[in-house]
Amino acid sequence: MKYYDLIKSPIVTEVTNKLIERQNKYTFKVAKTANKIEIKKAFEHIFKVKVTVNTSNVLPRFKRKGKYAGYTAGYKKAVVKVTSGEKIAILAND
């Protein structure tokens, strides 16, 4: 896979914003087939920063909307810690 295919989107919530401010950790959705080594190489190539990576698989959850029921899509999440003094510009106002 190419580096740009591995990283899908940032996960932006209140919890992830606190992680960015306090611990310099960024959270992203990544390809399900990607491993830690590939994710690390992708971030270092695209953003030109040194990182450490933790990954986890987020399981599908059961959801219901009226009479319709189903499951949300599962995905792989990567929490990327950037070395101190460096940043990743994931939003326009960074």
Swiss-Prot record:
One of its GO terms (cellular component) is ribonucleoprotein complex. Keywords: Ribonucleoprotein, Ribosomal protein, RNA-binding, rRNA-binding. One of its GO terms (biological process) is translation. It comes from the Bacteria. One of its GO terms (molecular function) is rRNA binding. The keyword Transferase does not apply. InterPro entries: Nucleotide-bd_a/b_plait_sf, Ribosomal_uL23-like, Ribosomal_uL23/eL15/eS24_sf. It holds the Pfam family Ribosomal_L23. Part of the 50S ribosomal subunit. Contacts protein L29, and trigger factor when it is bound to the ribosome. HAMAP family: Ribosomal_uL23_B. Belongs to the universal ribosomal protein uL23 family. One of the early assembly proteins it binds 23S rRNA. One of the proteins that surrounds the polypeptide exit tunnel on the outside of the ribosome. Forms the main docking site for trigger factor binding to the ribosome. This is Large ribosomal subunit protein uL23. It comes from Phytoplasma australiense. The gene is rplW.
